[in-house]
A protein has these predicted regions:
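Helix-biased detector of long, well-ordered alpha-helical tracts
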Residues: 1-338
Length: 338
């Protein structure tokens, strides 16, 4: 694609061209949500900042756009909502041209299509401090969810949709390769990236099953709570403890890991269990499932792992070691007594 600067064509024309290469129509005005009568509107939003949430040295723009959408629709799936629309605001720095922003937009549109989103709107804003990405996703929860959702109880199961810790290890590998490049000026071969491509992929392009809400409905399972575990399992446990008023027990030997997580952890001097607890960016959905639905859930959702259960309030939030010791969980942003 011919290099084009925004100063040459203007914002309005740039947005028109971006929509021209997307599956969405450019529309003005507010979004209209369609669904069953009595459905509840849910929104999820997230702001991504260059240098804080991503590094363009090694983050492909198309993957970045895809990941930003997944990060917001994941919050909707956690609340049992089906996404319908996204609103995108891009703060564009002077170093990015239109073809680069088109790559980013292509990733956004690819994720939106994959997650059955029917409407997208876009605005471009100048940025002095690097690329900024703001996405608001809106969806609907069916009336049956609010009508039939039961309160959580002690012994209810804590279930997660896939492996954890891999994204933090993948990011750490990329950072290590970046330091090599800055020191030597050459990344020829990059054997570590190829060897640990599943971990790197977990960070650069996390995926979520777009049909998870429908599959839960088909199995007649309504979780009492749902979370996107994007800031580590410890943070998720703290939120669940706060929201439910019940204790949370996670079992370290039940946490699912990517095959070579421990090999990579040894190389990086990072404990994969610590990465799972406090690393973040895994974008796994955690549901609290009634223990009465154990057999159905195990049969119908075999990609999920049961990593713990709710407990009496006085338990607080703990991780149970293979030896049976209960260790209190600590999470960034939470006071020690929370």
């Amino acid at each position: 694609m011919e290099k084009k600067n925004f100063s040459d064509i203007g914002k309005v024309e740039a947005i028109r061209q971006l929509f021209e290469v997307s599956p969405f129509k450019q529309k003005d005005g507010t979004a209209f949500l369609s669904g069953e009568k009595g459905g509840i509107v849910r929104t999820a939003s997230r702001l991504w900042l260059e240098g804080i949430d991503f590094d363009l040295t090694y983050f492909p723009l198309k993957h970045l756009g895809y990941k930003c959408v997944v990060g917001t629709v994941g919050e909707l799936y956690a609340s049992l909502a089906r996404p319908q629309s996204i609103s995108v605001r891009l703060g564009i720095s002077a170093k990015l041209d239109l073809p680069q922003v088109t790559e980013l937009w292509n990733g956004i549109c690819a994720a939106a299509e994959e997650h059955h989103i029917s409407r997208a709107d876009l605005d471009l804003i100048p940025s002095r401090n690097g690329l900024t990405i703001s996405i608001v996703s809106t969806g609907l929860t069916s009336p049956e969810v609010s009508e039939n959702r039961k309160s959580a109880n002690s012994k209810d199961l804590i279930c997660i949709s896939g492996n954890v810790g891999g994204a933090f290890l993948g990011m750490s590998l990329l950072e290590a390769e970046k330091r090599k490049f800055e020191k030597a000026g050459d990344l020829t071969g990059t054997p570590d990236i190829e060897k640990y491509k599943m971990l790197v992929g977990a960070y650069l392009k996390p995926e979520i099953n777009p049909d998870i809400v429908s599959e839960l409905s088909d199995s007649d399972i309504i979780p009492s709570y749902g979370y996107l575990a994007d800031r580590g399992l410890a943070d998720m446990a703290k939120r669940l403890n706060r929201d439910s008023g019940l204790g949370v027990k996670l079992y370290s030997n039940q946490i699912p890991f990517e095959g070579n997580s421990f090999e990579a952890g040894k190389k990086l001097n990072i404990d994969p269990v610590a990465a799972a607890m406090n690393g973040g960016d895994d974008f796994r959905i955690v549901y609290v499932v009634p223990i009465s639905k154990y057999e159905t859930f195990r049969h119908d959702f075999q990609t999920f792992s049961i990593i713990g259960h709710l407990a009496k309030p006085e338990v607080g939030t703990v991780v149970v070691t293979p030896e049976g010791a209960e260790l209190p969980l600590h999470a960034q942003g939470w006071k020690e007594n929370e």
